[in-house]
């Protein structure tokens, strides 16, 4: 008899009550996400799997739920760990106490810096953690063919990465023009995922009905870019799962909930996409999505189903998503469903977090490759290189941004200028994107409205998805010094006023992530936020994440790259 058969015989013996279970959970109120009901039952667990629910009475170890709700652990359907600015090990330490035990992660941020080496690092760093990180192979590196990033991933690279047992699916297909135009390299990546039966993640920002039809025909089966109820309905009608996103900059749940009905609710799941560490610590991960949906009027059982079973089925996670025989013995204890505060977290029958804290430390972090610690390479440039000369200052394209949104508007406006040279100040600030991977010296400049700074500048090497150095400022001196300081850090973020650095945070790992602990990163983020008041910034929303998306030329409408101002809807560069 092989070991596999012996394991199943042991589980079957416990399931049929011929032998005691390894673990017995008693006095719990089970949340049944299949029927959206609650009932009292014991849970029998053997070898880390649930073997029965009902009137079981024998277990070698007994866990008393003390009348609390027993809930399946949550699943984040789409996340970029890099946006939390900590390593996978530290990320797990933050999410597990929140009741999130599975995350579908796409490391395309770091892949845009260092390609295959970056993905391999993320896969290895994600192993043997209490958080089950399902790592996807990035499909669109770069996000658009004209981008200046640090690496690319070809179909052959994707093939090699799929051979790694730590790789789960194909990451979000951001380059939708490549799909719609039948690009051979992109179609080969999709075909590989299909052949392996792996999930294929979508990114259908702004696509009309015809484009959605083609996108779904290609085999892409979920999307997290719906921002209105109408967009969500259009996706569900075509067979997509809609991942309702609530991150730091993109907060879409309130707009999307009206699309959820009793008839279609099984086609919705939750995601965070991009969420800063301070927001994860303060609000939570997809546990916050659940709480927000409940606060907005959704039935708690429905919200829990969306955050568990729906996500598990969307991503073909057959052993997750419910408290039922054959599933992993992972579960949460929750006292009050209306507030959904997680009291305790069990992973495969083991207590891993209680009262918001881990019960044991996360293992030592995986070593970071040297290339990822040396990723910022700027060509020499002078302050004069930040001069923006306009063809017509009385009617020039301007990026209109709204804090809390990653979608911008294209506007034609009259802006302050002297001899045709833009003069930043007031509501009109200067945006700069400086190429930082190959020291090409390319600098994109634009005018942006919507950042409430009266002086100074902020800069960062977090600029989706090519992650060049991006900065916005009210004057060229501050802008110049902010860019140089961040480059000198080897990547990171800075708040600058004139030539004075008010606060800074190094992000040495690819210019995106810190090698410090989550607690240290939290403190540095707090210092950055506090320093913003000296620029006249009074808003609660973190401007750095809003800034980071101003360089992403696959989300409407007007964005800036190192090569210039780009109209996403027209998919073309525009003159200023």
Swiss-Prot record:
It is an enzyme of class 3 (hydrolase). The keyword Lipid biosynthesis does not apply. Pfam families: Adenine_deam_C, Amidohydro_1. It catalyses: adenine + H2O + H(+) = hypoxanthine + NH4(+). Keywords: Hydrolase, Manganese. Its EC number is 3.5.4.2. GO terms for molecular function: adenine deaminase activity. Signal peptide: none annotated. Belongs to the metallo-dependent hydrolases superfamily. Adenine deaminase family. This is Adenine deaminase 1. The gene is ade1.
